[in-house]
Amino acid sequence: MIKTTEHIVNNSIERDYSKSISLEHRKKFAQFFTPFPIAYAMAKWILGNKQLKTVLEPAFGLGVFSRAILSQQKEINIKAFEVDETIFENAKEYFDDFENVNILLQDYMYNDWKNKYDGIICNPPYFKFHDYDNKNILKEIETNLKCKLNGFTNLYTLFLLKSIHQLSQNGRCAYIIPSEFLNSDYGKLVKTYLIKSKTLRHIIVIDFEENVFDDALTTASIILCANDNITDKVQFNNIQSLQDLSKIDEIINKYPNFLETEQTYNFSDLNPEIKWKAYYQKQNSIKFKNLVPFSTYAKVVRGIATGSNEYFTFNLSKAKEFNIDEQYLLPCICSAKDAKTSFFTKQDFEELKKSDKSVFLFNAQNSTDKNISSYIQKGESEEINKRFLTASRTPWYSLENRKPAPIWVSVFNRSGLRFIRNEANISNLTSYHCIIQNKQVVSEIDIDLLFAYLLTDTAKQIFEDNSRQYGNGLQKFEPNDLNKGMMLDLGLLDKQTSDEILNLYKEYKYLILDNKNGDEIINKIDKILTDKYSEKKHWA
């Protein structure tokens, strides 16, 4: 039973639950609770439907959205779904006096397809494709929506698409979900459906410095939809903090009109094939001319995925413990933090090795060595061979065929991309992506010229247009984010300028290997490039 108004209009219920239920359990069911002020603002969008009688909350949790609605309008009939029995029992206790709230212990994605609702409001579970029954749920979507989606689609977007399908005439939908789908490959088909449905009205990107959801490392967006045929426009907005939530009120109160902003587009203007951050975030690339896709000069692929780093990675102590000869170990950078500067040398590798860091991968195909056989049997007894990746390999303990890449690039970043020249010529795990120069341009563009360019702020800023944003300023780049990202067309540089950059690069390398600061040199390279490629400049 909700005993006081205070419990309704804040997150004390969620805080009490989080204290009593383990983080492991909450993560298992993707329970990351929405701050009440955000839930309240989203509820206003639902309540803006003057014909509102029925509301659906597809992922009920502890009913923060229902509380937000009931605190503003008590006579609404609410139906809700929840799959976790623990939180379901808690929620039933809180809502047992509300006859107009019906909570069902059922999976929303497999139930209730034929019913329509005047309002649907939700913070759906954030599960990646391998964390839920994606084949069967995608089949449900395909059958009911006549929409075929990518097998890598995240569960939260499937909740959204089903809810849009269930809107009654003039019905409204408010979702808070990770922004990831706006800028990911699997999101293309989701965005296509949103455009085709013509229900999308607002995407409000929450650019908080702090995380919106406790314990969840993600950037969120509020998606507002309406099945009212009133407009063919969509508006993108950014809010920077909880103090800016009044902007959401302004957006809702203005509807069906929109705020005065350049970030308003017709459905026909939206391209589902591109990253939608182009619609809500200023693009760095517009400051430059003569840009080409990075894939023109190089290809980015992920590092080696073992399927079990604990089993496959080795240091000298582990090799000694299991009597594994070094000929069966592949030199590899196993931790991103072990490469500390822009150059990773053979000396760096030897120092890590002597420090007993993990710098090898088990690599023993076709060996008859009895110690190798014993270690393989150990893996099988621990069922390493049945893991998601290893189960599809023959033999299961074989490594992916990845030649050492001349350049590594960091996957996650807070202060811009890190590029590292792999002078030790060793392999890398997935904490770095591999950059391999295209064979057809090797004779045209020196690999050192490419690397010198990648070290500049200009290169990093242009790539930023293609990044994926997470909480607390964290950025992530998948290989295709970089492949499809833009870069200055270095092939247009004359020999004199190329030589000038390469000479500066040699100076920079000397300083770094001598443990000195080389920022001033990189700034000089940056200035040469911006002088050449700035939109305001003209080529000689």
Swiss-Prot record:
It comes from the Bacteria. SUPFAM superfamilies: S-adenosyl-L-methionine-dependent methyltransferases (SSF53335). Keywords: DNA-binding, Methyltransferase, Restriction system, S-adenosyl-L-methionine, Transferase. It catalyses: a 2'-deoxyadenosine in DNA + S-adenosyl-L-methionine = an N(6)-methyl-2'-deoxyadenosine in DNA + S-adenosyl-L-homocysteine + H(+). GO terms for biological process: DNA restriction-modification system; methylation. It is an enzyme of class 2 (transferase). The keyword Oxidoreductase does not apply. InterPro entries: DNA_methylase_N6_adenine_CS (IPR002052), MethylTrfase_TaqI-like_dom (IPR011639), N4_N6_ade-DNA_methylase (IPR050953), SAM-dependent_MTases_sf (IPR029063). One of its GO terms (molecular function) is site-specific DNA-methyltransferase (adenine-specific) activity. Its EC number is 2.1.1.72. Belongs to the N(4)/N(6)-methyltransferase family. Monomer. This is Type II methyltransferase M.AccI. The lineage of its organism: Bacteria, Pseudomonadati, Pseudomonadota, Gammaproteobacteria, Moraxellales.
